[in-house]
Amino acid sequence: MTVSENSVLETEVLVGGSAMPNERPGAMEPQKLSKMPEGFPRRSTVANGVRSRASRRFLVVGGALLLSLFAIYEMGAVFSIGGITPLEYLVLALFAVNFCWIALAFCSGIAGFLILLRKPRAKDLQVTELHTRTAILMPTYNESPDRVFSAVSVMAETLSQTGHGHAFDWFILSDTTDPDIALLEEQAFLVLRQETHKHSRVYYRRRRKNVARKAGNVADFCRRWGSRYDHLLVLDADSLMESSTITGLAQRMQADPDAGLIQTIPSLINGTTLMARLQQFAARIYGPVIGTGLGWWVQKEGNFWGHNAIIRTEAFMTAAGLPNLKGKPPFGGHIMSHDFVEAALIRRAGWSVVIAYDLPGSYEECPPSIIDLAVRDRRWCQGNLQHSRILPTKGLHWVSRLHLLTGIMAYLSSPFWLMLILTGLMLALQAHFIRPEYFTDQFSLFPTWPIMDSDRALRLFYITMGVLFGPKVFGVLLLLKDGEFARSVGGRIKAIFSVIFEVILSALIAPIMMFIHCGAVMSILMGRDSGWSPQRRDDGSMPWMTLIYRHRWHMLAGVMLGYAAILDSLTLLAWMSPALIGLWIAVPISAWTGSVKIGEVFKRAGILATPEERNPAQICLQAHEARAAYQKHIAEPWTLAQVLKDPALMELHLAMVDKQPLRAAGTPIEAMEAIVHVKVHEARCQQSALAVLNRQEMAMVLANPLMLRSLQKLPEQFVEEDLVSFC
């Protein structure tokens, strides 16, 4: 059968036409990191786009540098009165690294605070018609199909009502490896097509092999279909976006031909556990301060967070092809945290990368528990540390390098903070147990007393706490100033209670996360790869024994640090207690914060409430209703046995299988594919074949029409006369 005949057959089988449109192949070559590609950077074509002003960088980065130099000088002065020892030099160095990290966030927060005081409004571009085409991509990997497909259904329907639906196509790009979920996705896609085919173009493709994970998934789309579209709007499996935001992004791209990528700042929604609600509240109250400040000073040298952003296809395909790094994982191989690197490469090529901090209506969800956060952060930590090999890339803008460095420090800061705590503890124990040398080798009539400037040290402590908690304070001030905002979270009194509770609970969780990040860094330095595990989205609860096992080292570390502190004095133990209590009760904290029931208690009490929870956007309500409907639609899942038995079901399934050519005859065959071929061809019936195929092999069979046809030809069961089976 020819390709055209096959397409006609699919159109007849599937409501709304083929599962994917005709391919229009395009090149997306891996970029060279050691030298600038020819013709880069491109020249700007218009003067009405975003400009980068050095004055903003000077105010924020320069301010952070001056603040850091002052703090480092003060810390040096604390030690210098009696002469600085080697251990004190180490404390000074660790303090310098950690303070620079928080000073930049503080200065960005000041900028964001001042901007938000004026209540900026989203820019009205006055564009009435879109003449560009945008592909909206929803990558998914072993996610709940009811969540993914219902979200697309609602977004597609609301977008069609704006009159701009003709400018957008929707693509669900699956990398699912679980055969049961893969079949559920197909069922959900049939429902989605039935609902949307009259007003929207919605497509589905599941890759046979998920090479390079999410980045490879999007790159595969670009190479095969990307040339059909001017822009790519990339979502995540838990993303939602209002139609006004979708059209606003496309209009901004259309109005600024220099724009290569525009990133929104998503709001967190749908948190049911206490941990998820904590993240939602913190992101809603304090997040805009940092995000707005960051967007204000980075300007054309913004960043990409992997989703809820629109990308110019030309910029992405010509400038952001990711190379494989030399060596094996965790530092070699595919680039895991692809988003920062893609943004840096797009900017290197001369396109602008902008953070649209003024554009609302972008949503995502967050991990439901500390353990789920740890699993995600282990993967992110590996990807961000991998960026140490991207930093020397030729031609990157210094702000892009700073983004990469900031991502690295997001995880390296934990070991640095831990080392600072340990060296400070060692200084205290040294002063308590080791007799000081009052007379040095040099002749002196007076002894040398080991002293520090305690008043200056206390003042520096207050300054450090102010810098650390400054962005939180700015967020609270904005909340208290804005009466409408305060009412949207339950009023000022309840908001203050929520802030106090968030600060206390975050302080308890922080040392646990510090040790989790330290463990992740150590694991990576020891050469261990994170793999790619699907994320839990709703319930974060786990058995208590599992939690004890996962937090055993955290509790032990807390006990050991507490014992070391009490050897010096109860005063030192009291000073360290904010960092120790969370470690001592890590297991109950992890259990309680991951509980949906406890999260519901706090929701009813109105603690940690957000505007999106108390007054949800219409699209969020619609998505919730649609998900319940999809759960009913796919309540009776297909099985591979049913697909083989039912010819109509088989034709439906084959119409949704990726049409990428199979391995050509005579070319090398992978081990698993060879094993599956043997199992299929040796099987005497469908039942025996399914009995010997594991889940990974079943997923491969589902994506291979030839194997499916071979299995379909076999009898359902094998019966041999006069043969008696004994159990």
From Swiss-Prot:
It is an enzyme of class 2 (transferase). It is a multi-pass membrane protein. It holds the Pfam family Glyco_trans_2_3. InterPro entries: Glucans_biosynth_gluTrFase_H, Glyco_trans_2-like, Glycosyltr_2/OpgH_subfam, Nucleotide-diphossugar_trans. Its EC number is 2.4.1.-. Keywords: Cell inner membrane, Cell membrane, Glycosyltransferase, Membrane, Transferase, Transmembrane, Transmembrane helix. One of its GO terms (biological process) is glucan biosynthetic process. The keyword Flavoprotein does not apply. Its main location: membrane. Residues 18-41 are annotated as: Disordered. It comes from the Bacteria. It is found in: Cell inner membrane. GO terms for molecular function: hexosyltransferase activity. Belongs to the glycosyltransferase 2 family. OpgH subfamily. Involved in the biosynthesis of osmoregulated periplasmic glucans (OPGs). This is Glucans biosynthesis glucosyltransferase H.
